[in-house]
Amino acid sequence: MQVLLIATLVASVLAAPTEVSPQTSGGGGGGGGGGGVCRGFLYSNPICCATDILGLACLDGDTPPETPRDAKNFKEICAKNGQQARCCVLPIIDQAVLCIRPLGV
């Protein structure tokens, strides 16, 4: 039973998209929202993550302290604290489940 559960989890992770394209701010204006760095329905939560465990879990992670403009800015914001930029499915109390790198990072 446990083997079936683990196999199902691994299969679902492998079937998920591996990269998420960043959203452009649309030009003009003073910048856009940071909601575009993690696009897509599932991987929509930007997280600065200290430890990424094979994309299955992100330990000691939190939302970025400032709103990222794009994927490069997202990476820079997280790097200031020695963390990695990730787009995750489910953030829960300083951890997140199923995380990927945003496109351009």
From Swiss-Prot:
GO terms for cellular component: extracellular region. It is found in: Secreted, Cell wall; Secreted. The keyword Transcription does not apply. Keywords: Cell wall, Conidiation, Disulfide bond, Secreted, Signal, Sporulation, Virulence. Residues 1-15 form the signal peptide. Induction: Highly expressed during the whole fruiting body development with a 13.14-fold increase at the sclerotium stage compared with the hyphal stage. Expression is regulated by the GATA transcription factor AreA. InterPro entries: Cerato-ulmin_hydrophobin (IPR010636), Hydrophobin_sf (IPR036686). It comes from the Eukaryota. Disruption phenotype: Results in reduction in aerial mycelia, conidiation, hydrophobicity and infection ability, and complete inhibition of pigmentation and primordium differentiation. It holds the Pfam family Hydrophobin_2. Disulfide bonds join 38-87, 48-78, 49-58, 88-99. SUPFAM superfamilies: Hydrophobin II, HfbII. Cordyceps militaris is one of the famous mushrooms in East Asia widely used for his medicinal properties due to the chemical constituents present in the mushroom, namely cordycepin, cordymin, polysaccharides, glycoprotein, ergosterol, and other extracts. Fungal disease of Cordyceps militaris caused by Calcarisporium cordycipiticola is destructive to fruiting body cultivation, resulting in significant economic loss and potential food safety risks. Overexpression of HYD1 leads to enhancement of disease resistance with negligible effect on the agronomic traits of Cordyceps militaris. The keyword Disulfide bond applies. Belongs to the cerato-ulmin hydrophobin family. Homotetramer. Further self-assembles to form highly ordered films at water-air interfaces through intermolecular interactions. Aerial growth, conidiation, and dispersal of filamentous fungi in the environment rely upon a capability of their secreting small amphipathic proteins called hydrophobins (HPBs) with low sequence identity. Class I can self-assemble into an outermost layer of rodlet bundles on aerial cell surfaces, conferring cellular hydrophobicity that supports fungal growth, development and dispersal; whereas Class II form highly ordered films at water-air interfaces through intermolecular interactions but contribute nothing to the rodlet structure. This is Class II hydrophobin 1. It comes from Cordyceps militaris.
